[in-house]
């Protein structure tokens, strides 16, 4: 962490055994230099041997919205990061590892939260009504063990 902070502010870091090899790796959220908010520069993956790879760096004017989230599901480890560009919602980016290499899941960037409850993974959907304002409804996600990807339930 100290070496990374030399280059950019470290806003969040989750160290876990993401690839299941018994050693810890990390997903790290780095900020933009001299930012008064928590403007995100990128999300990086730190391998157990110290090598660092860019998981996603094409952010444009977004801030870290909340703490990052580590989720274990069906023997896999997932890293979720919520970002916001202002307004009433946020976007969640979702990452994991496959065959020892990090990857971004297909639903990444289209989710709004990612969490596990009662052995099911969920996202939320923003429902607005004039009477109650913004409400966030839990939406269960389907998981395909073969592709190691989540999908929305069929409508």
Predicted regions and their residues:
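Short, surface-exposed beta-edge/turn micro-motifs
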Residues: 24-25, 40-41, 76-78, 90
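Acidic carboxylate motifs that coordinate Ca2+ or other divalent cations, activating on Asp/Glu
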Residues: 21
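Extracytoplasmic low-complexity, Pro/Thr/Ser/Ala/Gly-rich segments
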Residues: 1-11
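Acidic, small-residue rich beta-repeat scaffolds with periodic aromatic anchors
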Residues: 1, 85-155
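A short beta-strand motif characteristic of beta-propeller blades
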Residues: 2-4, 53-60, 101-106
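Hydrophobic beta-strand segments that make up the repeating blades of beta-propeller
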Residues: 26-30, 78-84, 123
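Beta-propeller blade termini
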Residues: 9-18, 62-80, 111-123
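Beta-propeller domains
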Residues: 33-51
